[in-house]
């Protein structure tokens, strides 16, 4: 941040900070003018064991976008004063004051490591166009013209809450970015990991907390999806690295490499992880009004203005993803330029290592006093339990078919194909599911046993009910049946899909031509005529 203030001298401190992050190390920030904001702060402290003395209430604007004057007078200065007054940061006050009447402080205790910003605190600071000081003007000359911006994310400014004499234009490098050993080489500065619990509704903000806590107990279970068709090689490479990371931890995943995003007719079951770019507004599969993420999901879509609002559930990406049930997301309030936004593969690297959201955020963001934010519980550790621990507790987990998929994937990655099919077979007859049935068929096909592969998907003939997120999975099985020559099975699956309440117009428009072709091929002209009429209505 960007105005000269109190002289602060930091004593050296040791790291890692966040591998030992405790509830007592977190400031919880709320808007005293917002009932929901105050309630959320208490809710978080109650559920995470944060001392209530760590709550700081600020009387600030209820708007998402504020001016620099509002930020300084209603957030920055009151927050500094409050953390000292409440004993959250201990200081030695020195006399006399400087020429501006500001007292220099010496920090003697640095127990606070993170800030949890609650719904109700402003989101971003608009551009400051008035005349700047000579010091700031001189600084601005030293940075590229495109970076001489002073609009910013509130959270990114709070990360440098205790650093003096920072300019408004441009950004400040984050010394913890990619720091393999988490060694702070710049002892005169102290940075805070700032994450935000915010969503379009208070109920969803609460859910972000409770889902995170519940997911930590059982671990992440589901599949991953990557939309990797963005406009720049660097972003595509980042997401490719995430794909490689998922392979290393035996996660089942799907990748869309074209410019199109995953659509409603694509497979998208159990999306516990989603990474994508580069669309300006949420679209594709996320336009299905029935769509919901599983509890604890991590989902983000790289875009310059993905977090220009959090409160609107129908605009950009952050608000809609949280409204649809995500527990963690990343975003940008203004244009950050790609290289200065979160590096998602680094973010995932830390999470996979078992670190908290706070640590992953700090590790993966190259700069502060800029545009990027992280939303979620700072203490959330989605990979706190590894696969072996999850497998040991599998009988206690309701969604264990997707846990089984990961166990099978681990066996396949180790080239133990026979063991993988034995594992799939032994559990399928006890806990049948579309996902597991498809996996059995795919393994048989890889083992060059096409008849057994085809036999493995025959169960789909008898299914009569599909959930919203199973519809695309059903289509994938129908396509395999067609590919492997069982046209009757493929037609039967499509006939079932077309009768589902979960069928959307987008699904129908994508699948009806295939169904019509199959019905005609098998002389079911009543069906083909019926579906032609339906398709014609949809195209009007």
Where are these regions (language model features)?
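Structured catalytic cores of large enzymes
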Residues: 64-240, 245, 369-383
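C-terminal soluble interaction/assembly domains
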Residues: 291-364
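Caspase-like cysteine protease fold
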Residues: 353-415
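Generic helix N-cap/helix-start motif at coil->alpha-helix transitions
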Residues: 397-404, 431-438, 467-475, 504-512, ...
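Solenoid-like repeat scaffolds
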Residues: 425-431, 459-467, 496-504, 534-540
């Amino acid at each position: 941040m960007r105005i000269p203030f109190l002289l602060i001298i930091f004593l050296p401190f040791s790291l890692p900070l966040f591998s030992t992050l405790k509830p007592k190390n977190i400031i919880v920030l709320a808007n005293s003018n917002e009932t929901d904001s105050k309630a959320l702060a208490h809710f978080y402290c109650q559920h995470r064991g944060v001392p209530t003395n760590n709550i700081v209430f600020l009387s600030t604007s209820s708007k998402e976008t504020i001016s620099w004057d509002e930020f300084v007078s209603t957030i920055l200065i009151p927050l500094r004063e409050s953390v000292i007054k409440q004993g959250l940061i201990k200081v030695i006050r020195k006399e006399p004051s400087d020429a501006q009447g500001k007292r220099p402080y010496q920090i003697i205790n640095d127990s606070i490591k993170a800030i949890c910003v609650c719904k109700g605190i402003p989101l971003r600071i608009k551009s400051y166009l008035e005349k700047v000081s000579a010091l700031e003007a001189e600084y601005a000359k030293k940075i590229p013209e495109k970076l001489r911006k002073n609009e910013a994310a509130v959270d990114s400014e709070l990360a440098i809450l205790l650093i003096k004499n920072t300019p408004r234009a441009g950004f400040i490098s984050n010394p913890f970015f990619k720091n393999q050993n988490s060694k702070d080489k710049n002892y005169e500065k102290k940075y805070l990991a700032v994450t935000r619990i915010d969503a379009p509704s208070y109920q969803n903000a609460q859910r972000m907390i409770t889902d995170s806590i519940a997911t930590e107990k059982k671990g992440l279970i589901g599949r991953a999806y990557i939309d990797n068709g963005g406009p720049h090689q660097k972003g595509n490479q980042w997401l490719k690295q995430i794909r490689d990371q998922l392979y290393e931890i035996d996660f089942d995943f799907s990748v869309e490499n074209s410019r199109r995003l995953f659509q409603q007719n694509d497979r998208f079951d159990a999306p516990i992880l989603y990474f994508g770019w580069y669309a300006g507004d949420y679209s594709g599969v996320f336009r299905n009004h029935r769509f919901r993420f599983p509890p604890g999901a991590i989902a983000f879509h790289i875009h310059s203005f993905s977090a220009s609002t959090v409160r609107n559930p129908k605009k950009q990406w952050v608000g809609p993803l949280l409204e649809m049930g995500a527990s963690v997301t990343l975003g940008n309030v203004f244009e950050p330029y790609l290289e200065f936004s979160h590096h998602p593969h680094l973010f995932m690297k830390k999470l996979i290592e078992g670190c908290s959201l706070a640590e992953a955020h700090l590790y993966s963001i190259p700069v502060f006093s800029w545009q990027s934010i992280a939303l979620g519980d700072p203490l959330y550790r989605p990979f706190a339990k590894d696969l072996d621990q999850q497998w040991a507790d599998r009988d206690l987990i309701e969604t264990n078919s997707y846990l089984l998929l990961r166990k099978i994937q681990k066996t396949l990655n180790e080239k133990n194909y026979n063991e993988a099919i034995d594992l799939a077979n032994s559990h399928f007859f006890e806990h049948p599911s579309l996902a597991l049935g498809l996996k059995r068929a795919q393994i048989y096909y890889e083992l060059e046993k096409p008849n057994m592969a085809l036999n493995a998907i025959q169960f789909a003939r008898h299914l009569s009910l599909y959930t919203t997120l199973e519809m695309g999975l059903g289509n994938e099985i129908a396509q395999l049946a067609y590919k492997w020559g069982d046209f009757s099975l493929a037609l039967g699956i499509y006939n079932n899909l077309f009768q589902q309440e979960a069928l959307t117009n987008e699904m129908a428009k994508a699948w009806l031509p295939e169904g019509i072709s199959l019905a005609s091929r098998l002389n079911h002209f009543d069906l083909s005529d019926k579906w032609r009429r339906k398709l014609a209505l949809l195209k009007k």
